[in-house]
Amino acid sequence: MLGVAIGACAQNADYVTQVTCRLASPEMYGRGYDHHGDSIAAEFIRQEMIKLKLKPLGDNYLQYYNLDICYIEDNPTLKLKGKSLRPYYDYRLQPLWRLKKETLEKSKWNLLTEDFLFLGTSKLGEAVPLVPSGDQKLQCYVEILNPKCKAKAKFLDYDIHVVRERNYRTQNVVGYLPGESDTMMVFTAHYDHLGSWGDSLCFFGAHDNASGTALVLDIARLYSTTYPHRYTLVFMLFSGEEAGLCGSSHAARNPLIDYSKVKLLVNLDMFCGGSEGIAIVNATDSLCQPFVKQLIAVNDSITRLPEIKQRTNAANSDHYPCTSLCPAMFIYSLGGPYGGYHSPADDCQSCGIAQNYPNMIRLITSLIE
């Protein structure tokens, strides 16, 4: 089977690039919860699974669950001393739970209004989703890249609407290919991203994680025409990762499969790059070590990526909720090219997934053998 997989891999870049670019297109609205971008993306993924003749799990490939969300409605505007500031580039909204004492202390100035706490700063924090902060009315604070101005209410003019929605229904997308045994290899990725700020700004999320989603679908495509499979192959695409591993946590708590029969779960997140190789999170776990050694052996003899970096476990992607249920690891690419992390520049045009893809998929699919 490995020979079949390797021989077919050279043709895979077209499909994986096509899917990455479709998921990172404006019509997906950043795959967030404003404009129901998550549902648009989920339906696209579901239709791909149908085309590939995967068998459904859940409710016709969908596993529904609810979560509380926040998002920015309409086009936000913010002026400081009459000057219009650009969202993301000049200011960023951060969920209130991220606010730390040292952040306040390091801010050059601050101003509390009825709706927001504004902070003047010399460096903006990473863009993240707006996750509700309990029952508090104030859900987020605003970092402004302007440390020199002493802010006063009369100098600050804003029109920013943050919508909070409880029990928003979203979904994981899950399908499988039956094998000769009920032992399973599971491939996962999250398809959600940061969404958009009205019509003024979109986080396309090509690297994070349209690329990983496309890779999972391409593995399904590759094996959908090669029978019989030694193992049952399961493909899980999660929403809610950016909001705190919500989709994968729900899948772990409400299993659609018997995790005791999973040989290995491989989570794929951020694959537009790869010029420097790959990293494996949870590589040092005793249950994962045999698979890591297998990857190193294949890389040394066949794929020859520059590096396979081994990392200890961390709650930084969707493998983590499953680590107590089965052997689970998280693989991501090292190096470029890609357009940035949690940035509007993370678009299809900046994604270099095709450049390093043949050896990447050769290596990953070797785990199925």
Each language-model region and where it sits:
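Bacterial Sec-dependent N-terminal signal peptides
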Residues: 1-14
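Second-shell loop/turn segments in exported
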Residues: 26-36, 63-66, 87, 98, ...
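Noncatalytic luminal/extracellular "stalk/propeptide" segments of secretory-pathway proteins
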Residues: 29-125
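His/Asp/Glu-rich mid-to-C-terminal helical/loop segments that flank catalytic regions of hydrolases
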Residues: 221, 339-369
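Short helix-loop-beta-strand segments that form the rim/entrance of peptidase-like active sites
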Residues: 221-246
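Metal-dependent peptidase/peptidase-like ectodomains
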Residues: 238-338, 354
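Soluble metallo-hydrolase cores and metallopeptidase-like ectodomains found primarily
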Residues: 87, 95-101, 124-205, 221, ...
